[in-house]
Amino acid sequence: MAGIPSTSAPPKSSPTASPNPFAAPRTSPGSVGGQPSYLVPLSVLTTLFFMWGGLTSLNDVLIPHLKGIFALSYARAMAVQLTFFGTYGVMSIPAGSFVKKIGFKKGIIVGLAGAALGCLMFYPAATAQSFWLFMPALFVLATGIVILQVAANPFVAVLGRPETASSRLTLTQAFNSLATWAFPTFIGPIILAVAGLSAAELAKLTPEARHAQEASAVQLPYVGLALALGLLSLIVWRSKLPKIDTDSADGTNSANLLPDRGSAWKYRHLVWGAVGIFMYVGAEVAIGSLLVNYFKEPYILGLAEDKGSKLMAKYWLCAMIGRFVGSLFTLRKFNPGKVLAAHAVIASLLVVTSVLTTGWTAVLTIVAVGLLNSIMFPTIFTLAIDGLGRHTEQGSGILCAAIIGGAAIPFLQGLFADAAGLHISFILPAVCYVYIAWYGLKGHAVDARAKAAS
């Protein structure tokens, strides 16, 4: 999925010009020929986007795995997403203050260390065979990722020419999407394969011993991820990342600057945009969280969990493809609001089609939703902060907090699935997309229309 936007809005990129997105501004100190390259620090930052995208996507593997081990209802299984994305709502504002105090580079290192600690906490949770012990591990992991995102995003926004900032952000988020496909594809089957035991070996185990084997399947992958995060923190520590001043990039250069109303909360297009972020993240996460169980249903494909994990990864692969296409073509050629509305309408229709069908038709239509999700986050974000001027920082914080939709909507769908069935529960994401379509068509322009009429 997409990372949290920086607390300072990137200027819009020109729809016609395509300068090197990695070149620094001409006024940058130490420039050679007016255009030094920030390729090395941007490569390091892109690796961070890749890692937190992958770690987040593994929740979609954990949910069916833990649901099977502990015989959980859908609602209880969604405690994974409730804990993980609930952390965004709790920790985003404190993380921003923390990073502002210690600096962005140190913030990145602390975020990586926190995420590594969270991964290591999976080991004792699995040893104890306690579902609820996984929740503190997820909270610590998510806290590390929140700090990481708050610290890393401003670098991407300012390392290069202002007119190509959105291009850099979208391309960097594409690598985040790449990880959301790669991790479930290559790490997911390791977790879901019951520690590599054959069916004959599993048959010889008592239920208690089998549960122990299943729980231990998460230990090695997450310890490996902790080591990778630790290594990455050392690389960042040794890297010479330039110092940046976000106070000089507050978005006040917007051509559509609106009258100052004293607070970001007084701009309706921002508040409704936050609802859009809530709906988008909630719908995307809810669908991804339940796909493995969905593919397991006999009226869909009846797939085993390890095979379902590989198919689920295609949902995130579609998001990656769509993000590359959107950043390089769609959003450069067409009105962003109309593009957002079209994507949301088609996504809603695809979900409804999946609900009304079975077999491969249901599978292909729900997986294709990932393609439509691809441009929603950056487009909603850009439309929502447009014209806020000096309130852009506050507006960005409001949008970040709205990511808690990734906790609320999946939990509600879990309750719906328990009460009415998994198949019909996907109607909830379809409703979310209807709201996003309205925002793309009408909601984002409400304050601009009021300004024009005054």
Question: Language-model features: where?
Answer:
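Helix-to-loop junctions at the C-terminal end of transmembrane segments
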Residues: 91-104, 322-335, 417
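Extracytoplasmic
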Residues: 40-67, 152-153, 287-295
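Intracellular juxtamembrane helix-capping segments at the cytosolic ends
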Residues: 147-161, 374-389
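Extracytoplasmic gate region of multi-pass secondary transporters
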Residues: 59-63, 184-192, 263-313
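Central cavity-lining transmembrane alpha-helices of secondary-active solute carriers
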Residues: 79-97, 313-326, 405
